């Protein structure tokens, strides 16, 4: 007889190899055909909801790993919440307006000047929608489930109308105004920028010290003294109208070789060193506070203009001279302090950053090129004390990567000052996973200036503002709502297709327009106002969603972006934050923590990972990251992820193979009748389940990744599944011992598949389709396992046993190295108590020790004279006695010796007898 034919070997059609790149699209097609997203919602439609509001990615360009990280974690969250019984719709969105799309069309050869604004905008729209189709397909390929057939898009008429109405409510509250203020201005984009559109890079700049002669000392300083200022923007000197000093700082008039200079005393040594003064030749002649210097008049170094000495709290002693060059047309602090003194706002640059006629001798020069001309003129006037060059962190346009400037222009603003405290209070009411997230957005709101919301572009939502003949601004509830209604019906292109009069309510009149003529605003809204209105355009508009959302989750750059603009508009109009919980992730770097770039050749993109390895590998990688900070990816990291995946897959396959003849309805053993080792594993499963559920609740996916590996490697592979082979393969098919183990194995398989489902979406579905007797058609329509109390006493007992078993394994390994045994079934374990542990008494509680140790024989003694001492007993390993059973390979002294049952141990004889 071939005894192999009598073994109950694993059987399953579940393949060992994943073949994910080919298999995943088939599974996704099945989900689409079954409309699984709708089924998942329908299942929980009467339950409490959980709303994760999708921050809209920009509809331009292919997906990068940051997109994948973001969308995959969102999918973890929504799928988990759905399996926990929540009604959890997920509506993906796209941000579609703004300069990058205009630039993309220009690169494609679209000549904006050869068409009307409305025609150009139509091309922008077509481009954006094509980009959305590409990105949508790629997001779905990552296994992300959502309402992709009905996403929200910021260019749709209903969204734009909601945005206009929100704008109108802010205007009604006096939060929208027009003013000439210095704003971040990008000459390369020819537009103003919000703080969220600024990024900092190193830049080499001129560093100059300039002397301003005293013109009218007011009897406070010597008339032949000079104020020294320091600046890294020489091109702003033509706009200088003041010198700001701190009212409480002490200043000194210093005589240096007959020259009299005024600087802050706290900075005098640094100034002396910078200007190369001989310390022995410096004399402090006079002292005064900044307050005492107020209203002293200095002379502009090369213009016929007074530079007034004023007081400002923003002056520090971190660098410079303590006497701050002040040009209200080119700096926010300068502008604010200048307002108090009614100083003129001079900003002689055009949109391209080129000096206008107002710039005098610098007319026609690009501001950066004017630096040299200004310093040359200062030198000519003997006002330049020092010219140097420094490299410092400087604001750049996030799109063009070119430097920006502060430039005073007429702009539309949303007032932050009027709602700042309300926003800060709303942040206090918001939950955060990490304290630094709260600190970050709190400080940004606390410190940010007014929000410039106008842009001098065409591809965006028009500002719904009209002007009367006399220049009066028309922005009433009636006119704004009428524009919103028009946008909702026709889309915002109507603004560029119709005259102002046609966009106003029928019969509208205004005292400032006696002839009934009106003009319309040409600026559009900041794209952050677009996406920052999504709580109105989506949460409050879509019937399946609600305000506020339970969660906003985006990259950490959104503390100054979408998180910021959203809470600003929500607090301004609804008096509360649009999110209950705020969570963020870091950026994706290469394997060495460097930024990915084509030039370095270290770029990995989602499409490449999916085609080569599969979306589940990308998803498992995401779960393996500490996403709260920057994460790393490389071919080597993905190889490690693939190895972990293979281990998970093979473990699930092993369990599938060993329950092929098990029906939980008829073959299950009641928990009280399970073997104790099986009850131990059931309780370990419950511990693992409780921990995994807790980790999902706390968005701790790295913990899940690590604990899954630990459970599979330590509990299953290294013990239970290895131990179980002697039972599952060898025992009689329906023996109590075998059915006891299959009962627990089935539970482990089902629960693990559910717990892994939000992460390994395709593999879990594949396992589910091969699992016999499951009720739900899809694992994603099943519920998460319930958290059940564990038997602590049982776990404590078996945890001690597992530690003891580790000692036995160490002894077996030693015996293997010494050639006493080969495989562990060749061993007899002799074990006894020692001073550190009463092994003999402890092991009296356990049966079938030879199976638990995976050896042929175990002898427990009070004392082992020739054993090696371990923490949990003295252990001696011998070669097993007797001969090897040809069926189970255990050694015994009771081998059969007759006919069919020859060379079989008594246990195998009993099993085979039933088969003959």
Swiss-Prot record:
CDD domains: Anticodon_Ia_Ile_BEm, IleRS_core
Binding-site residues for Zn(2+), renumbered to this chain: 885, 888, 905, 908
GO biological process: isoleucyl-tRNA aminoacylation
Catalytic activity, EC: 6.1.1.5
Keyword annotations from UniProtKB, A to Z: Aminoacyl-tRNA synthetase, ATP-binding, Cytoplasm, Ligase, Metal-binding, Nucleotide-binding, Protein biosynthesis, Zinc
GO molecular function: aminoacyl-tRNA deacylase activity; ATP binding; isoleucine-tRNA ligase activity; tRNA binding; zinc ion binding
Cofactor: Zn(2+)
Top enzyme category: ligase
Catalytic activity: tRNA(Ile) + L-isoleucine + ATP = L-isoleucyl-tRNA(Ile) + AMP + diphosphate
Subcellular location: Cytoplasm
Domain of life, source organism: Bacteria
Cofactor remark from the record: Binds 1 zinc ion per subunit.
Statement: the UniProt record of this protein carries the keyword Nucleotide-binding: yes
Domain-related comment: IleRS has two distinct active sites: one for aminoacylation and one for editing. The misactivated valine is translocated from the active site to the editing site, which sterically excludes the correctly activated isoleucine. The single editing site contains two valyl binding pockets, one specific for each substrate (Val-AMP or Val-tRNA(Ile)).
Functional summary from the UniProt entry: Catalyzes the attachment of isoleucine to tRNA(Ile). As IleRS can inadvertently accommodate and process structurally similar amino acids such as valine, to avoid such errors it has two additional distinct tRNA(Ile)-dependent editing activities. One activity is designated as 'pretransfer' editing and involves the hydrolysis of activated Val-AMP. The other activity is designated 'posttransfer' editing and involves deacylation of mischarged Val-tRNA(Ile).
Family of this protein: Belongs to the class-I aminoacyl-tRNA synthetase family. IleS type 1 subfamily.
Oligomeric and partner information: Monomer.
Identification of the protein by name: Isoleucine--tRNA ligase
Organism listed in the record: Staphylococcus epidermidis (strain ATCC 35984 / DSM 28319 / BCRC 17069 / CCUG 31568 / BM 3577 / RP62A)
Upper taxonomic lineage: Bacteria, Bacillati, Bacillota, Bacilli, Bacillales
